[in-house]
């Protein structure tokens, strides 16, 4: 398990933020405010919509604004990493930051996406173990997944991406056991994979991508014990997961990763380790239903 739960060294105001542009889509305020209410804390967690040209000034002035830290969402994760005074190993390997906090006047950064991914697997598929993983995609999300799987001790991590060069770059950055494969031998890897992860937006932006070629995955070639997960959570059960289920495979949706990645930040800012519960999941699902409705 990746340990991102070290608390700030000093007592800081219980006021945190999530910053992005746009920000209205973010579920973070509902997650953190749910926990604040659940644990009877008097803190605040506020959404901050900041334009690109204003982001640097915003981030460097957050302590003066009374914030003890916050989350960073699209499109600023890489810029937040660059601006932070201290970056831990996780953020450095992933090359992006989504969780910030202060130690004195020093702005510190980590990335909790890898933690969220691992915790979601442990929560949704307890006692599951594997040695070989197949990952679709080589974007920012894939970097977090690669870090998580290396930390979990996977012996083989196979990477497939439409643009091979991006996958090659990631394999060079992370080193063994990451290896890049071409689409023509995906069938062989499918049979060997204990875990299949979709880190692309296919299923959200291209509902039929799994069968038209943008993300083709023949689940008939997998082992019956293979676990399949998709980091996309809108829709909750993506076409990718639907097909895996249709072939009797165990699946894990992406909502749990979103919920679990929020845990380390909340603990840093408010001093309590929150629990990802069925009640929280239900609350966020209700909110998603309201937005779709």
From Swiss-Prot:
What are the GO BP annotations of this UniProt entry? Answer: amino acid biosynthetic process; aromatic amino acid family biosynthetic process; chorismate biosynthetic process; shikimate metabolic process
Q: Which UniProt keywords apply?
A: Amino-acid biosynthesis, Aromatic amino acid biosynthesis, NADP, Oxidoreductase
Q: Whose protein is this, by species?
A: Bartonella quintana (strain Toulouse) (Rochalimaea quintana)
The EC number on file is 1.1.1.25
Keyword presence, GTP-binding: no
* Residue positions of the active site: 77
Q: Where does shikimate bind?
A: 26-28, 73, 98, 113, 233
Looking up SUPFAM superfamilies in the UniProt record yields: Aminoacid dehydrogenase-like, N-terminal domain (SSF53223), NAD(P)-binding Rossmann-fold domains (SSF51735)
Sites where the protein binds NADP(+): 89, 137-141, 161-166, 231, 254
Assembly mode:
Homodimer.
Top-level division of the source organism's lineage: Bacteria
Spell out the family assignment given in the record's similarity comment. Answer: Belongs to the shikimate dehydrogenase family.
Named from the GO MF annotations, one term is: NADP binding
Question: What job does the chain carry out?
Answer: Involved in the biosynthesis of the chorismate, which leads to the biosynthesis of aromatic amino acids. Catalyzes the reversible NADPH linked reduction of 3-dehydroshikimate (DHSA) to yield shikimate (SA).
User: Does the keyword NADP feature in the UniProt annotation?
Assistant: yes
Transmembrane segment boundaries: none
Cross-referenced InterPro entries: Aminoacid_DH-like_N_sf, NAD(P)-bd_dom_sf, SDH_C, Shikimate_DH, Shikimate_DH-bd_N, Shikimate_DH_fam, Shikm_DH/Glu-tRNA_Rdtase
**GO CC entries:** cytosol
Pathway per its UniProt entry is: Metabolic intermediate biosynthesis; chorismate biosynthesis; chorismate from D-erythrose 4-phosphate and phosphoenolpyruvate: step 4/7
Q: Which reaction does it catalyse?
A: shikimate + NADP(+) = 3-dehydroshikimate + NADPH + H(+)
| Protein name, as recorded | Shikimate dehydrogenase (NADP(+))
* One matching Pfam family: SDH_C
């Amino acid at each position: 398990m990746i340990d991102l739960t070290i608390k700030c060294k000093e007592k800081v105001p219980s006021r945190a933020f999530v910053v992005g542009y746009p920000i209205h889509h973010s579920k973070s305020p509902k997650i953190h405010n749910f926990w604040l209410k659940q644990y009877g804390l008097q803190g605040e967690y506020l959404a901050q919509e900041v334009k690109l040209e204003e982001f640097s000034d915003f981030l460097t002035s957050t302590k003066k604004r009374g914030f003890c830290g916050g989350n960073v969402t699209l499109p600023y994760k890489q810029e937040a990493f660059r601006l932070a005074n201290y970056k831990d190993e996780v953020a450095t390997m992933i090359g992006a930051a989504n969780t910030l906090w202060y130690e004195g006047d020093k702005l510190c950064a980590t990335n909790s996406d890898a933690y969220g991914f691992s915790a979601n697997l442990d929560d949704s598929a307890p006692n599951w173990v594997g040695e070989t993983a197949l990952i679709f995609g080589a974007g920012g999300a894939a970097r977090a997944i690669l870090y998580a799987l290396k930390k979990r001790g996977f012996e083989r991590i196979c990477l497939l991406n439409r643009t091979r060069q991006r996958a090659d770059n990631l394999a060079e950055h992370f080193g063994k056991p990451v290896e890049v494969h071409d689409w023509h031998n995906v069938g062989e890897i499918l049979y060997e994979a204990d875990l299949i992860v979709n880190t692309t937006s296919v299923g959200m932006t291209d509902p039929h991508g799994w069968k038209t070629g943008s993300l083709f995955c023949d689940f008939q070639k997998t082992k019956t014990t293979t676990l399949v997960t998709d980091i996309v959570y809108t829709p909750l059960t993506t076409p990718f997961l639907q097909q895996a289920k249709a072939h009797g495979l165990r699946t894990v949706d992406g909502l749990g990763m979103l919920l679990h990645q929020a845990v380390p930040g909340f603990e840093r800012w408010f001093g309590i380790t929150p629990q990802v519960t069925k009640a929280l999941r239900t609350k966020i699902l209700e909110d998603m239903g309201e937005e779709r409705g």
